[in-house]
Amino acid sequence: MTGPERAAPAVDPSVVVVDLSVVVPAYNEEQRLGPTLDAITAYLGDNEGRFGDWEIIVADDGSDDGTREVVTSRSLDNPRVQLVTSPRNRGKGNALRLGVAASRGRRVLVTDADLAAPIEELEKLDKELGEGRAAAIGSRAAPGATIESHQHPVRELLGRAGNFLIRKAAVPGIRDTQCGFKLFDGDRAREAFAASRINGWGIDVEVLQHFRRADWDVAEVPVRWSHQSGSKVRPLDYARVLTELARLRARSLRPVDVLVPLLFLLMSVALYSGRFFDPNHRYLEDSLQDQNQWEWFFAVTADNVAHLHNPFFSNLQGFPDGVNLMANTVMLGLSVPFAPLTLLAGPAVSLSVCMALGLAATAAAWYWLIVKRVVRQRAAAFVGASLAAFAPPMVSHANAHPNFVILFMIPLIIDRALRLCAGTRVVRDGVLLGLMAAYQIFLGEEPLLLASMGMVLFAASYGVLNRDVVRASWRPLLKGLGIAALVCAPIILIPLWYQFVGPQSYKSVLHGDNAGNSPLALLSFAERSLMAGDEIRANSLSLNPTEQNAFYGWPLVALAFAIVVRLWEHALVKALAFTAIAAAILSMGPKIRIPLTDTIYPGPWALLAHKPLFESVIEGRVAMICAPALGMLVALAVERLAATRELGTQYVGLLAVCLALLPLVPAPLKAVDRAAVPAFFTDGTYKSYVRAGESLVPLPLADPGAAEALHWQTAAHLGFKMPGGYFNGPYGADRIGIYGASPRYTSNMLRDVRYTGVLPTIGKNWQAQAKADFAYWHAGALVVAPQPNDDKLRTAVEKLVGKPGKWVDGVWVWDLHEGS
């Protein structure tokens, strides 16, 4: 779309305006400049009927060869050839500013001194400008371009990479910004170049950015191009262009768009403040045993990366059977990139940094999507994104589940799917969507499944309301999704095969009949609500503190209802409302119990509960879909209120928003001092008790209820293997997924002793069973650390082994090599 008509700037009456100015930047071009000037003057002289009066301005950038003399000699023969000079070499950008500022043309052609694009190509550019464009730029990458002589392959590769970065960071949609052959409307060119600040090669990008911001139409025109020897582009110039791109990108950002991510980071750090500043010695109490588990995941991934081991499997816990890491949420998409930090600072630091940054990045991604797709008002988008990322369910999972907190890819996937509906660049968008989906699978499969459910709910409702949109978008959408699947499949095929068929894979994980949300949970407040939290009530309405998947509070529900009623005429509002309501109902599970009654109704989740993939989902988590939907509804309301001129309406409306959101503001997550790791592990004493192929057996075995032994293992730099643990693995012939290792008689008995303090009668049968279990575990030594009922535990182990343990560096040890 062409920009609005602009009045021409005031022109000095003494200055003669010409039809075309040709600006040639030059630095030490003594050898190439003469033929270039001859070719241009000859062509323009032969085509004055088409191009009218013309001038050539050579902008010398402090050359120290005979460049100026070449221009001076041509000026004597043809006064239309002029020279402007810079006292010293400052770069192409400086030269172009000088040359364009000195121009008088209604149109300005900028061409490189090597004339790699022949002057005859001017006719193509002139035709585009004649159709109302503000600029026509020659392109080597546009369809129809001809490359008659290629650059060196390395230089060509660097150029393509540079153009890709430029498209992503500065001027999306333009394939080639660096072809030195561009025709501009004269007045607009002088304005854009005068506003430029870059002295280097990045000025082309800066000027095109100026045209974009001014909404001036730019056409990319395929041209003939031939590489010329003697290029002034040096290897370091590519690095300088990257620096200039970074400057342009930073300059194009609004201050608020820089401030908002910083605010999100501060909010995230505040939430994690109890652990963030000393992660090695602090523990998130409400994470139960998940912090131990996730630190182990990060540690074992880093170890696999460092030693080039299989990233999908480990036998460090669950020994000897091991753990299918791909079937557990190890988040290879982050635990692998964070491996250097894990190896350097330890898994506690790495996990803490990852979760704080990931939560902030997720909020920033929702902010970006809301600004791009929902509202333009930044404050409204900030409020909506804050709710989407810091809603009570997200805060609950922030205790323990980084895969449900670090969701920055979800807004990007949503945006890319919406681009497919537009149908403009289906192949490109399909490829990118496939890559994004593949990466999200390595961040978390269940969040991707839930996000897909939310997108389907939204698309279905929006499609019913906008049949024309469906008719226009279904073909490119299906084509793009097909391309995405073709791109994604080869990347994830082997990992998913390993997950579902590989060692220690399982069919599904059963969560019981109480995993759905009560309707009361949707209206109540979460435990960590700073102003309205009620620990007893929240725990009574949820599985545990890490699974408070609803708890939006009745004020927000009431506000959302009011927003939907007030803005009902908008299809977007209706679709968001349907998405939130449908997700809330699905989250109640296959059976919905009406509060305060014994009445139970079948829920729609029953249709999905036993389907593949869905059977392993904790259905209460479906309510997390409500968070971004509610965030967008609130953002729409805040934008509407900010724009109204009725102060009473604005005041009452914004007050209602504040009253609905303030009860949801979370208190920092609870953190406590971490129990010290016994010196037996940290000092390496354990090494003298465990031989190659053997395991060290902490008793009772680590399990989902007590996984401190995983912390001991990471503190010992994964120096020993152990049975038991906290992971998802198979059980029985049906390979049903369970939490922890398959139970054995000895481990079950010792666990009962630990929790009840009741010691069973231990005779020859128990001793024989223990001997078989120790052999199965390849046990080299048994360890009992100080813990509740440890005296009863020691007695039980002594009777099983037939000898007392030894107190060694903070633990009791039974060396099974000593004839037991």
Predicted features by range, described:
Residues 267-362, 391-407, 516-540, 594-606, ...:
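Membrane-interface coil-to-helix junctions
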Residues 511, 658-820:
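Extracytoplasmic
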Residues 60-69, 115:
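A conserved acidic beta->alpha catalytic loop
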Residues 1-17, 171, 195-256:
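Hydrophobic helical membrane-anchoring modules
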Residues 467-479, 560-602, 644-650:
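Membrane-interface helix-loop-helix junctions at transmembrane boundaries of multi-pass membrane enzymes
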Residues 86-102, 107-110, 119-201, 227-236:
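Acceptor/aglycone-binding surface of glycosyltransferases and processive sugar-polymer synthases
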Residues 288-304, 477-480, 484-564, 606, ...:
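Periplasmic/ER-lumenal interhelical loops and adjacent helix-loop junctions
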Residues 264-267, 355-373, 378-465, 480-495, ...:
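Membrane-embedded helix bundles of polyisoprenyl
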